[in-house]
Amino acid sequence: MPKIKTNRAAAKRFKKTGSGKYKFRKANASHILTKKTTKRKRSLRLDQIIGASDLKEVKRLLPNG
């Protein structure tokens, strides 16, 4: 029986928190920032928690946490 492999693309994007939830960074915060408002850029700095609809798929991609 082969080992279960972690999806490396997902591993780079999602991190498991201490409480078992998964956090990720929002998109659109790396370049072309001059036309974005300060409020929008400030909200993009915050990490987000995976929603219930995506949680099952992320757990499948990251079997080892």
Curated annotation (Swiss-Prot):
The keyword Ribosomal protein applies. GO terms for cellular component: cytosolic large ribosomal subunit. Keywords: Ribonucleoprotein, Ribosomal protein. InterPro entries: Ribosomal_bL35, Ribosomal_bL35-like, Ribosomal_bL35_CS, Ribosomal_bL35_sf. The keyword Methyltransferase does not apply. GO terms for molecular function: structural constituent of ribosome. This is Large ribosomal subunit protein bL35. PROSITE patterns: RIBOSOMAL_L35. GO terms for biological process: translation. Belongs to the bacterial ribosomal protein bL35 family.
